[in-house]
Amino acid sequence: MHEKYKKQLLILTGMSGAGKTVAAHSLEDVGYFVVDNLPPELLGNFWDLMNTSEDFEKVAVVIDLRVKSFYKDLIDEINSLEDSGQTQATIVFLEASDDTLVARYKETRRLPPLAENGRLLDGIRDERRILTPVRNRSNYILDTSKMTTKELKQKLQSKFGELHKPKFGIEVMSFGFKYGMPIDADIVMDVRFLPNPFYIPELRPFTGLDKRVFNYVMDKDETKVFYGKLLDLLLTAIPGYIDEGKEKLTIAIGCTGGQHRSVSIAQQLARDLSEKYPVDITHREISRYLRK
């Protein structure tokens, strides 16, 4: 990227079906403000607008053959922008082999922009020919034929994400099944099989935040065995979630009402996981049981 300019402009372009949508999301994840499908003739006005704001230091624009007169207008607009001294654009061009693009289009049941009468290969070849001038002008050319989505994301983020590294965090949530499962949970553990303080009259009014309830749940032999295995499982799985680029992992622990067992387990889990990761804890049902 060009360090002399305060704001960075990246133009993401290339063959339809080569992975521009994945690439755009990947750039958003490392701090870029991304605009999709911008007509080339608006590039100059768009950049003027970006320069009026202090909020956007890294900007990416996706431009491809969904807009007409692409090959001519885009190069002209980039040249005009650079000649004015406002910025030095970095052009990233994504491509893939004909066979790969045909396979991807068949999988999605869509057609390339220039395919007429459903002729996939002709449309792909016409697009490749029209985009040649832009490809020749590009700073980076990525062939995604043999890349997985994860590999493309990692390659782009390692190249253009040096100013911003996504932070990983965990939310541990207790809840009650009787009030519905949390729809945003990544991992749900059902602890309704553990001994229930609800049936101990002197513990029933309290929650897992109370030391007596917590100790009752956590000191049971079956809880110790289960919890040890749960913690081992999560410590094994979490690095995989991080490698996949996940920024927030929500672990939900559920019991019947979200009062005793799930709260106790969630408390201990948050405490242990916080030794390695940033952790927030939420007790979804706790307000139902706090003594007024």
From Swiss-Prot:
| Superkingdom to which the source organism belongs | Bacteria
Which residue pairs form cystines in this protein? none
Keyword Nucleotide-binding listed? The answer is yes
Q: Which residues bind ATP?
A: G14, M15, S16, G17, A18, G19, K20, T21
Listed GO MF terms? ATP binding; GTP binding
User: What InterPro entries is this protein classified in?
Assistant: P-loop_NTPase, RapZ-like, RapZ-like_N, RapZ_C
Cite the Pfam families for this sequence.
PapZ_C, RapZ-like_N
Name the UniProt key words of this record, in alphabetical order: ATP-binding, GTP-binding, Nucleotide-binding
Binding-site residues, GTP: D64, L65, R66, V67
Its biological purpose is as follows: Displays ATPase and GTPase activities.
Record PANTHER family? RNASE ADAPTER PROTEIN RAPZ
Q: Which family does it belong to?
A: Belongs to the RapZ-like family.
Concerning NCBIfam families, the annotation shows: PRK05416.1 (NF003828)
HAMAP family of this UniProt entry? RapZ_like
Protein name per UniProt: Nucleotide-binding protein Ldb0621
Q: What is the lineage of its organism?
A: Bacteria, Bacillati, Bacillota, Bacilli, Lactobacillales
